[in-house]
């Protein structure tokens, strides 16, 4: 197999603050379940744009994604950050909090385990793994850990950054950090918004 070393993989992009937007010659994969937002991201020659959701429970299935289109946000004078408030198989809590379920768009999407995405795209090294899935980040990382434990540590992402805000269970965040520290990661920061960890062990091919 011809493995590919990636500069980044980002899971859950919306259409702002993305790695693909700042990428020029980098190799990457940008994964987003909302096609409306994925299509608004720039096309880069070395970056794959994948329209799917990364499964929280490692099961492949058909699903629905709940989101707001930008024109509906503007027409209803809603805050712009709602572009990033999307949810799998249910309304986002902001949709309910703001009483805007009537303008939420719902579309079908495929949920795919992260390990399958990595294998299908011949992924080996990953310099940066960025996850922002509105509450599912720790579940994805726990699934990823099982995959990584079957590989040499050359497959371990060098940097992992994931969302750890009010949508995240603090106990789950802490247990995820501890599990990755056991793999050789060192916590750089966890500030109530995001958590960042760096892999510190020397690479081993086997």
Predicted regions and their residues:
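Short internal loop-to-helix segment that lines adenine-nucleotide cofactor pockets
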Residues: 1-6, 87-151, 168-171
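SAM cofactor-binding core of SAM-dependent methyltransferases
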Residues: 1-69, 164-166
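Structural motif
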Residues: 7-9, 29, 125-128, 159
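S-adenosyl-L-methionine
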Residues: 46-115
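A short acidic, amphipathic alpha-helical/loop segment
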Residues: 18-24, 40, 140-147, 175-179
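Conserved beta-strand signature within the Rossmann-like core of class I S-adenosyl-L-methionine
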Residues: 154-164
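Binuclear metal-ion centers of metallo-dependent hydrolases, dominated by the metallo-beta-lactamase
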Residues: 171-206
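Short, flexible/disordered intra-domain loops and linkers
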Residues: 77-78, 167-173
